[in-house]
Regions:
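Buried hydrophobic positions in well-ordered alpha/beta secondary-structure cores of metabolic enzymes
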Residues: 6-8, 34, 63, 74-77, ...
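Condensing-enzyme catalytic core mediating Claisen C-C bond formation in acyl metabolism
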Residues: 1-48, 151-223, 227, 231, ...
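Catalytic phosphate/nucleotide-handling subdomain of diverse soluble enzymes
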Residues: 291-311, 320-326
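Phosphate/pyrophosphate-binding loops at sites that engage ATP/ADP/AMP, CoA/4′-phosphopantetheine
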Residues: 59-75, 231-248, 296-301
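Acidic, glycine-rich active-site loops and adjacent beta-strand->loop/helix elements
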Residues: 12, 80-85, 111-114, 139-144, ...
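Conserved catalytic cysteine-centered active-site region
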Residues: 35-37, 41-54, 81-135, 265-293
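Active-site pocket-lining segment
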Residues: 225-230, 244, 248-267
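Flexible, glycine-rich active-site loops centered on histidine and acidic residues
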Residues: 128-162
């Protein structure tokens, strides 16, 4: 059977670190308050001259190196992001140029924190259809650029970085077994950034109203995310006739430690089967899952033929899951 197999992973986070204590000097918060409610200790943020394509490029280089191929071997580049360098052209096109992968098609996916899984599912479809042999899938963000550091409810959450995988068209049982994707646009006003698009283009008024920063109803997002992700992971296991105890590692979107724990509890997974790095990076949106995947891979937390379950939830609302045999 033809499958899209992950043959390389890579990740990159900027050097600059913003700790909880740093944030406590900006807004009314504390290390204890943030850790208790989110599990986040620190996050990496972009430095001068760094943008989303900067991080995507570094993560891509590492993934290509592990895969043992060159950028010239790629048929397609897909980037999941909500923080592109600019509205157009896409981060994927900028990345294509940096990599000199001029033979590859390139485009972005905007699906909130689920962007990487949406991109992974699209790449899987292209490979299964026989239209691509090698695809680079990247999740990359510069959320610090759209974070309001006067808003204590959101500034504690977000960080920057990128993760990448190389998918290869191969025969066998290893690779992406299944993906499930969902969306509910009726909840778009619960997590959004109103400024900068065609509805509210940049102006003195939109800047004064702070429209160019993320807005979020944290409580409603949390409650919806827990239920949606619990249902999603159960459905993908049922679809593939797999039980929770067969999962070797759960890699959830690193948005909130309590959400990750709720999903693990639903699947009755012990701690050693749940990958967590939120304490180091915070919520990196589309970059979250591929960064965690790369770290788990390089820490030898995943072995050949292991079943890996990934899931994410984000603005839109969007959510989804992917089941992979390593």
């Amino acid at each position: 059977m033809v499958r899209a197999r992950i043959i390389g992973t890579g990740s990159y986070t900027p050097r600059k670190i913003l700790s909880n204590n740093d944030l406590a000097r900006l807004v009314d918060t504390s290390d204890e308050w943030i850790m208790t409610r989110t599990g986040i200790k620190e996050r990496h943020v972009a430095g001068d001259g760094e943008a989303t394509s900067t991080f995507a490029y570094q993560a891509a280089l590492k993934a290509l190196e592990m895969a043992g191929i060159t950028a010239g071997d790629l048929d397609m580049i897909i980037v999941g992001t909500v923080t592109p360098d600019m509205l157009t052209p896409s981060v994927a096109c900028l990345l294509q140029h940096k990599l000199k992968a001029y033979q590859a098609a390139a485009f972005d996916i905007s699906a909130g924190c689920t962007g990487f899984l949406y991109a992974l599912s699209i790449a899987d479809s292209f490979i299964r259809a026989g239209n691509c042999s090698k695809v680079l899938v990247v999740g990359a963000e510069s959320l610090s650029k759209i974070t309001d550091y006067t808003d204590r409810t959101t500034c504690i959450l977000f960080g920057d970085g990128a993760g990448a995988v190389v998918l290869s068209r191969e025969q066998g049982q290893q690779g992406i077994l299944s993906t499930l994707l969902y969306a509910d646009g009726s909840c778009s006003n619960l997590l959004y950034m109103p400024g900068g698009g065609s509805a509210h283009p940049a102006s003195l008024e939109t800047i004064a109203k702070r429209y160019h920063y993320l807005k979020m109803d944290g409580n409603k997002v949390f409650k919806t995310a827990v239920k949606a992700l619990e249902d999603c992971v159960v459905k993908i296991l049922e679809k593939n006739k797999i039980t929770g105890d067969q999962i070797a590692l759960l890699i959830s979107h690193q948005a909130n430690l309590r959400i990750i724990q709720a999903i693990a509890k639903r699947l009755e997974l012990p701690k050693e089967k749940v990958f967590v790095n939120i304490q180091k990076y915070g919520n990196t949106s589309s970059a979250s899952v591929p960064i965690a995947l790369d770290e788990a891979n390089r820490q030898n937390r995943i072995k050949k033929n292991d079943l890996l379950l990934m899931n994410a939830f984000g603005a839109g609302f969007t959510w989804g899951s992917a089941l992979v045999r390593w």
